[in-house]
């Protein structure tokens, strides 16, 4: 845990947020110290004080920044101000009033000042780092009253020698929640004070219906409470561990019992106690509006199903409990669907379109992995209820869409956001092509959101389900609500996950931030990306050229001779060179070769990558013809370096053959050759060079790509295939691809070589490509066009194998940001994560910007809102009246706390 005075980046970000929302403390608001060490803490009246002229009244300001109650609420709830480009998180479909965050403010306000200092703010951020932050803040809230009582007792008995100060001091001290030896069993709350605090909450809430019907939770009536009490110095205490257990178990049952007991009436027809639909909806809103989707309350219609022995006017206790049982296990059902999605590798479209029947649902529930994991069972009645709720919700959305009636749907009105609309109609239409697919994906989600999640998922892939054995046994005759055959996975997730829609919006926030970053730097990105590919291509080219240079040397000697008088074949050439010139002779001209091959191979590899990316279609596919065009373009672009390189290299490689004829020519250096030829001479034979390199690359690169795909099952776009190859596989694919490309282009290589060297005495001088072809056919034979063909295959095949293998390995070892994305291509899946804070990056197959998985928050962005919602839910779980906590209730609590210590 970081210290409060830490200067880490995280603390600087926290300070930035604090300053953005903070107000300036005034002299009237600052706490005043008194002689006994206690504080007189007046209420903060105004956080933005101004003088009569409308400007800040500097005489009243202390310069200290603080967060008032309103500042803190605004900070937590208005994430749109800093972090979000789209929404203020109003897409959360469970209802958590923002004023409930005042409970957090009260809990972390040290010394009950009425405002938060910077240290208080840092302390709050530190608490959020703990796994059980919501329980810790709940404990701090109630502990404040215990501490004030202890201080009052200490103040009263300060002069008494019989007063044991140690016990009081230990309770007053701040708690190190990072202590790994700390147990929740050691964190105690005075039970009587705890009850008084709950009673104070009830007194502060003005709800006559709740009070008249005795729906308030009275802790004095809880029979189970005696089993959780512990005693210290003759007083009753409740440990935090016990309180958590009560929250998870006993309190849920008490709420159900009290709610039904207080509102149920005798049904004369069914001869049983029952609730009406309105009473049921009221209790659900009262106890579970913060936990479930708001759409559920309008989807509880029991009159359109005959599989449940209840209707809207008579809902018995067992159906009432079944509904609450479902609510309590929505998270589990949500995880089951996630597991199903993961096991079947479903994508977003599948989730929108795949049909879920009761038979499918039962198959998933009864799967062996669920049984092994002790997935709890659901009764037929509970499953019928679930399908009824989901079906009613879908039907309601369909009717709302048909009638275009949004006046009665406050949530739906709020789902339309002008910022999203602006983004679609501006950046989407004028965005760069690199982000096009990402923006189109964004546009698909936008239509769902702007319709207020009213989109009726079409059934495209799955056919209409037939009635199976399960339906026959449990369903009887057809049932309109529970036997629908068009309910999709998405329909269930909208009910089971109250943040379903907000997760989609949050994903868009991340996408838009990333897209903005891309647009800002877009003009520089191709430069850096090309430099990256150019550098790696240069290194890889040098490695490949060095490995096969002796073979290239022999190939050139064989192509240069016009008869078999000197070298009979490649082996004979190799032996004679070694005997006359030594091993060193095989590397004559390597220096200029390395100087030129770096940019040559770099240009070829970079242009090929560039063209393949440009010609890839929207689905991430590249057909054969664009592959050929990409390779041909790469071959054409490399000639600007290849031709000067080749002519100097070839002349150095054959110069020893001129020893007996021209001593000066036999001893020329690379520099002298360049000066002698001049710029124009360096491009002799450029047409022949193009005729060789363009078809070579047009053959080589598509062949290499298809060998990787067909021979080694490599396809990063297909998650069922491999997305990475071993080194030997890359070498093999590169070598095999080089064989046909090298051999078929050998005639053009022979012509180029002949044009780029000076003829020996008695040999015909070629005047151009066609003259060279006619002369070779006349003086030699057709076979001469394939001189050195074997050596060329042996040279080109491994050279490009080594070059491309090195290139791809270097891209893996030294990844650019873009390649980091590509290294995880095709892994588009939904994952179950026990930690909701963890993120799962989803990458498009063409290396586009990453997306965050739908069903979790994102730690790269501030989570104040999400974590504060979790804290607020814990308070409301304890007592639903915390949902009405506001500034007036806060003042009552603050005044009561001050009154304890006089």
UniProtKB/Swiss-Prot annotation:
Gene Ontology CC terms: mitochondrial inner membrane; mitochondrion; vacuole-mitochondrion membrane contact site
Subcellular localization(s) per the UniProt record: Mitochondrion inner membrane
InterPro entries per the UniProt record, alphabetical: Mit_carrier, Mito_Solute_Carrier, Mitochondrial_sb/sol_carrier, Mt_carrier_dom_sf
Alphabetized GO MF terms: antiporter activity; L-aspartate transmembrane transporter activity; L-glutamate transmembrane transporter activity; uniporter activity
Family per record: Belongs to the mitochondrial carrier (TC 2.A.29) family.
Main location: mitochondrion
Pfam families for the chain: Mito_carr (PF00153)
Keyword Calcium: yes
Descriptive protein name: Mitochondrial aspartate-glutamate transporter AGC1
Transmembrane segments: 534-554, 591-611, 622-642, 681-702, 731-751, 786-806
Protein origin, superkingdom: Eukaryota
Keyword annotations of the record: Amino-acid transport, Calcium, Membrane, Mitochondrion, Mitochondrion inner membrane, Repeat, Transmembrane, Transmembrane helix, Transport
Function: Calcium-dependent mitochondrial aspartate and glutamate carrier. Transport of glutamate in mitochondria is required for mitochondrial transamination reactions and ornithine synthesis. Plays also a role in malate-aspartate NADH shuttle, which is critical for growth on acetate and fatty acids.
Membrane topology: Multi-pass membrane protein
Sequence ranges of the Solcar repeats: 528-614, 622-710, 725-813
Keyword tRNA processing: no
Gene Ontology BP term (one): malate-aspartate shuttle
Annotated gene: AGC1
């Amino acid at each position: 845990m970081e210290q409060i005075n830490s200067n880490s980046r995280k603390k600087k970000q926290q300070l930035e947020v604090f300053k953005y929302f903070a107000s300036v403390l005034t002299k009237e608001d600052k706490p005043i110290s008194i002689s006994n060490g206690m504080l007189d803490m007046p209420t903060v009246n105004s956080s933005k004080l101004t003088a009569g002229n409308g400007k800040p009244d500097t005489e009243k300001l202390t310069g200290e920044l603080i967060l008032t109650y309103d500042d803190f609420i605004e900070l937590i709830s208005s994430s749109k101000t800093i972090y979000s480009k789209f929404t203020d998180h109003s897409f959360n479909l469970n209802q958590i009033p923002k004023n409930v965050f005042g409970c957090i403010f009260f809990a972390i306000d040290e010394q009950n000042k009425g405002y938060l200092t910077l240290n208080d703010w840092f302390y709050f951020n530190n608490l959020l780092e703990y796994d059980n932050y919501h329980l810790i803040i709940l404990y701090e809230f109630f502990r404040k009253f215990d501490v004030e009582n202890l201080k009052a007792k200490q103040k009263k008995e300060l002069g008494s020698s019989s007063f044991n100060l140690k016990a009081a001091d230990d309770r007053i001290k701040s708690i190190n929640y990072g202590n790994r030896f700390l147990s929740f069993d050691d964190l105690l709350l005075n039970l009587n004070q705890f009850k008084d605090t709950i009673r104070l909450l009830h007194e502060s809430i003005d709800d006559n219906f709740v009070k008249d019907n005795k729906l308030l939770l009275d802790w004095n009536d809880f029979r189970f409470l005696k089993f959780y009490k512990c005693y210290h110095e003759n007083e009753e205490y409740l440990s935090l561990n016990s309180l958590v257990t009560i929250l998870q178990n006993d309190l849920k049952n008490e709420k159900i019992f009290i709610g039904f007991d207080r509102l149920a009436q005798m049904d004369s027809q069914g001869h049983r106690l029952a609730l009406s639909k309105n009473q049921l909806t009221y209790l659900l809103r009262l106890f579970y509006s913060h936990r479930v989707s708001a759409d559920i309350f309008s989807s509880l219609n029991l009159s359109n199903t005959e599989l449940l022995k209840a209707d809207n006017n008579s809902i018995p206790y067992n159906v009432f409990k079944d509904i609450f049982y479902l609510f309590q296990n929505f998270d589990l059902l949500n995880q089951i669907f996630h597991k199903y999605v993961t096991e079947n590798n479903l994508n977003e479209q599948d989730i929108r379109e795949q049909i879920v029947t009761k038979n499918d649902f039962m198959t998933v529930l009864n799967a062996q992995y669920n049984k092994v994991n002790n997935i709890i069972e659901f009764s037929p009645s509970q499953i019928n209820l679930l399908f009824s709720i989901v079906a009613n919700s879908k039907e309601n959305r369909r009717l709302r869409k048909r009638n275009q009636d949004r006046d009665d749907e406050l949530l739906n009105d709020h789902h339309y956001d002008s910022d999203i609309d602006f983004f679609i109609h501006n950046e989407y239409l004028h965005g760069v092509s690199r982000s096009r697919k990402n923006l189109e994906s964004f546009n698909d989600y936008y239509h769902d959101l702007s319709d207020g999640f009213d989109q009726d998922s079409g059934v495209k892939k799955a056919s209409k389900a037939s009635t199976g054995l399960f339906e026959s046994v449990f369903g009887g005759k057809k049932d309109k609500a529970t036997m629908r055959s068009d309910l999709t996975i998405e329909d269930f997730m909208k009910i089971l996950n109250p943040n379903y829609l907000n997760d989609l919006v949050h994903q868009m926030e991340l996408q838009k931030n990333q897209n903005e970053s891309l647009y800002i730097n877009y003009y520089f990105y191709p430069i850096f990306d090309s430099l990256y590919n150019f550098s790696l291509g240069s290194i890889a080219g040098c490695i490949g050229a060095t490995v096969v240079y002796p073979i290239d040397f022999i190939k050139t000697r064989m192509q240069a001779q016009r008869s078999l008088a000197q070298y009979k074949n490649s082996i004979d050439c190799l032996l004679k060179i070694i005997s006359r010139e030594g091993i060193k002779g095989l590397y004559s001209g390597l220096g200029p070769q390395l100087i030129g091959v770096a940019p040559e191979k770099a240009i070829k590899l970079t242009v090929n990558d560039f063209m393949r990316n440009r010609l890839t279609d929207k689905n991430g596919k590249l057909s054969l013809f664009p592959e050929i065009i990409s390779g041909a373009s790469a071959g054409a672009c490399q000639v600007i370096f290849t031709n000067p390189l080749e002519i100097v290299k070839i002349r150095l490689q054959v110069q020893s053959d001129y020893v007996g004829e021209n001593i000066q020519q036999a001893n020329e250096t690379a520099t002298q050759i360049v000066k002698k030829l001049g710029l124009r001479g360096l491009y002799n034979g450029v047409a022949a060079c193009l005729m060789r390199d363009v078809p070579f690359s047009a053959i080589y690169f598509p062949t290499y790509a298809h060998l990787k795909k067909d021979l080694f099952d490599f396809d990063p776009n297909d998650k069922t295939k491999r997305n990475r190859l071993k080194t030997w596989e890359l070498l093999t694919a590169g070598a095999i691809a080089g064989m046909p490309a090298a051999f078929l282009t050998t005639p053009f290589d022979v012509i180029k070589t002949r044009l780029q060297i000076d003829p020996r005495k008695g040999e015909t001088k070629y005047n151009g490509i066609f003259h060279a072809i006619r002369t070779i056919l006349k003086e030699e034979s057709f076979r001469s066009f394939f001189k050195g063909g074997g050596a060329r295959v042996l040279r080109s095949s491994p050279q490009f194998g080594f070059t491309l293998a090195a290139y791809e390995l270097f891209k893996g070892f030294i990844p650019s940001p873009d390649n980091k994305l590509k290294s995880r291509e095709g892994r588009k899946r939904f994952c179950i994560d026990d930690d909701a804070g963890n993120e799962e990056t989803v990458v498009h197959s063409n290396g586009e910007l990453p997306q965050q998985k739908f069903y979790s928050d994102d730690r790269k962005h501030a989570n104040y809102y999400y974590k504060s919602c979790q804290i607020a839910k814990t308070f409301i779980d304890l007592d639903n009246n915390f949902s009405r906590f506001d500034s007036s209730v806060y003042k009552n609590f603050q005044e009561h706390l001050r009154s304890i210590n006089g």
